[in-house]
Amino acid sequence: MATIQVSVITPDGAVYEGDAELVVVKTVEGELGIKAKHIPLVSPLAVGPARFIKEGKEEQVAVSSGFVEVRPDHVSILAEAAERPEQIDTERARKAKERAEQRLASEHVDRKRAEAALQRAITRMDVAKHKGA
């Protein structure tokens, strides 16, 4: 199967470079699957995992919003923050999840910020499960 080049870039530099048969990202409109020769597009990303599948194996990167730019031969994910599974501190993510849940239980809270923090923590914990995969 044909592959497409993939780059995940943050303000701190490249987090992932490789090629994949299928790239799946979470956009603000829902999940988007991308294969080689996809039509060009740019879409805002939601917090979620970016998945890269090649030869039946899947790699993931936790993405904290940004944009995806698709060209027929390359996918660029420009993220505010992104982490590979081995970079994620699962204990820190678990504590962030607990704090976000506590804030959401409070009456006087910026719900949008607390929900975003909760989603980031859940995404990081889910992606961390792919360490060594």
UniProtKB/Swiss-Prot annotation:
SUPFAM superfamilies hit by this protein: Epsilon subunit of F1F0-ATP synthase C-terminal domain, Epsilon subunit of F1F0-ATP synthase N-terminal domain
Region: Disordered, residue numbers: 81-110
Gene3D superfamilies given in the database record: ATP synthase delta/epsilon subunit, C-terminal domain (1.20.5.440), F0F1 ATP synthase delta/epsilon subunit, N-terminal (2.60.15.10)
GO annotation, cellular component aspect: plasma membrane; proton-transporting ATP synthase complex
Tagged with keyword Transport: yes
PANTHER family linked: ATP SYNTHASE DELTA/EPSILON CHAIN (PTHR13822), ATP SYNTHASE EPSILON CHAIN, CHLOROPLASTIC (PTHR13822:SF10)
Protein's name according to its UniProt entry: ATP synthase epsilon chain
Organism: Shouchella clausii (strain KSM-K16) (Alkalihalobacillus clausii)
Name of the encoding gene: atpC
